[in-house]
Amino acid sequence: MPQLKIARAVKPAELGYTMPAEWEKHEATWLGWPHNASDWPGKFETIPWVYGEMVRKISADENIFLIVRHKHDENFARRIFTHVGVDLRKIKFVTQPTNRGWTRDTGPIFVRKAESGKRKAETAIVHFHFNGWAKYDNWRKDTKVPEIAARLLRKKLFHAECNAKPFIIEGGGIELNGRGTLISTEECYLDPKIQVRNPGLGKKEIEATLKNYLGVKNIFWLAKGPNGDDTHGHIDDICRFVNAKTLVLVREKNPRDENYKPLAENWERIQDLRLEDGGKPEVVELPMPSPLYFDGVRLPASYANFYICNAAVIVPTFNDPNDRVALGILGELFKNRPVVGINAVDLVWGFGSLHCLTQQQPDLGRRQTPSTN
């Protein structure tokens, strides 16, 4: 493995790095091959086939880094991909033991410094540390993934810290427009008692650290996420930017549903959001599917958990009448990308979906403008 370049004394923002928006061009997508059957008890056998469909769609116009535990997993993945028609030349297998495959939260988070004069554009990796969503005990293998990625890609690695302690944030807990605004939830990162990621840190310190490591200037807090989310309020089930000035926000129309009040509160709060330039964003309503249960457990089924790749926008669907409605709304917002549904009924039994499994690696080129969505 190449020698690792670790930057500790300076923060990414000081060097001009910022986190690009998801719709900007990708060099690759990172995924972790599913192997922890306890994440999908009773349904694990179907999950590799969902991955096959995801990889087929994503790899149409970008490379895939797929984290596997060993050669057996790699060979199994190759068989699945061959069956569904994936071009294996687009897949780079990365052998690294992991606890789970939720790469949005455990994988490398990339920041980029733009080209300036004789200075070339470059990307680096921020290691926001991971503690199993402050809920599970088996996470120590997962926390090594960003370092492995930095070594493999020969990228500079920034270890996120606050008050000389590792700073914990998951990729699914932050949503950015690539121009300076970040949205998260109080439930996820400001709750002082439940699933506490950074004990002892208050809102001011958390915001300052996010600004230092992601290059954002403007942070806005929604309240809570939908019931069934075992991450305790990840934003990627609630609210997503589709371009620099437009976002979708989920809404529950049934007043008897347990999600009605918390999601309604988010709609009240979003009226106060101002972007980094002081402007007010356009907010588009995204419906919720009917409640989805398995073994009596409510699952965090949400159309907001879509992933924007170069070739398409892949959207979780749930055999629900609102599948078509959600796909239609997103199709109107992403004019220049096909919007494609992927059945996620079994996948969401793992308490996550398409966005939770993916992590984008931005291209070094110029950012795409919102009109190219």
Give the residues covered by each predicted segment:
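The feature marks the mature, well-folded catalytic cores of soluble enzymes
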Residues: P2-Q368, N373
